[in-house]
Amino acid sequence: METRRSNLTYSVIKEVNTKNGPHMVGKTTAMLEDCGFDACHIVDKITRNCTNPVFSINGVRMLDEYYVAKSKLNVAAGDTFNEEEGKRIARERVLDKYHSDLNEALCAYLQDAREIVARLENYMLKHNIDYSSALTEDEIKWSKLSGKK
């Protein structure tokens, strides 16, 4: 999965010196920083484009401030050190962690939004309030999100 982020950094340790001489480590660490408000920024951008923005980002779960993942050379299996491959593996792992957390936060917000809609519709039905003029979810998708009028 791709990322547009510039805050992905790498730390590469090829070998370490021991009392018995150099020892091949081949460890690559990828760190994705400054992630805490990412889900909030996405929800804020979406809600700002609503016809009547009434939802806020107060209920959006914060992400971890940073994510870390590593790849390590398996000397016993006969691996040879390849810095680019180590970076690719570490990058893939850190982005998997990040996107899993981001998706979980966005799904939780969506669940809350759907519950609000269900509770509001239930209230309006109980009190005989006509809400037929409000667009349905499918009508909103068709008219506002597909570019069609």
What are the language-model segments listed below?
Residues 1-149:
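Catalytic phosphate/metal-binding cores of nucleic-acid and nucleotide-processing enzymes, i.e., regions
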